[in-house]
Amino acid sequence: MNDLVNHPLWKATDPAKMRLVRVWQFPPEANPFAKDGVIIKIAGAPGEVMYHKWPMARAGILDAVRKGFITPDTTVVEATSGNTGHAMACICNALGLDFVAIMAPDVPGSKIDVIRALGGNVSWRTPERRGETTVSCARRLGKQDDWHNPDQYQGGWNPRSHAEYLAPQLFGQTPVSIFVTPAGTMGTCMGIAQYARENGLSTKVVPVMCEEGQEVPAARTFSRMKKDILLPWQEYFDAETDLEYGTRYASFLLSYLSWRLIPAQLGPSFGLALVGALRFLRKHKISGTLDQFRDASDGKVHAVVFGPDDYRPYNGLYLAERLYDDDYARGVPSDLLELIDLR
């Protein structure tokens, strides 16, 4: 019997007993669609976990332990932009397992440092071969004897964990006509879509990606998604009609401005989701198709924008954008729609 299965860590970190998400209403004064009966709400992961990837990372390690892929002698390796890697590193550290995070050279140093600080069995490296992505590197290393790659970009435990833990808490707090989330692994959007489908809900799930050449931390461009992600996202989303996109500058700017509007300081991938949400709502207002999303109980469109983590791991990137030097540092513009196409 693999003793890791019965480790006390699993009981202590049971997501079903934690608060995983909080919901705040976006001020109507800052909502460009308030007069159209649209209520914009912000769902932020910071609750009793640092970020929403923690339950998913836990599920990935536990799934492999139960299946016997991870034993006390296994080295766990995972491609990560930071949050999943940090969560898996914490879990492996507690279990006494060696963990290697594969991270791109452009990952902020602050995100690398929180993994490095764990010390002990935890290490990180960049891809070693020319043209190799972090994901392909982790998959290659995971095939070695006594190594295992949980692979958040392919493992069904990723969307399943969001459907099992995040979705019930989210839908228990608010009606959700439209759910907008940054797309990194496609796991969050697939999990919410799966939950909605299984519960007979009409919720429209909108994944938001970076425009090509407009990278935002913890999100992907469509070309990178096609290269790395093996989860069957096409079962839920049409590439031509269901995806929204955003630019880097607008994503950083809108997340920065949101710190004055809600009691949370969410990171740049939230800004990307907010850009995508506003673009989505603008498109449907122009085409006269907003009514299809109205909730039967109150006739309102409840648009929920998801923020996976807060701003602190990206301090250096915010400073590099120098948002504090321009007019936006003095207040929030009256019309956010003027900002969502900025580059």
Question: Which sequence ranges carry the predicted segments?
Answer:
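PLP-dependent amino-acid enzyme catalytic core
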Residues: M1-R343
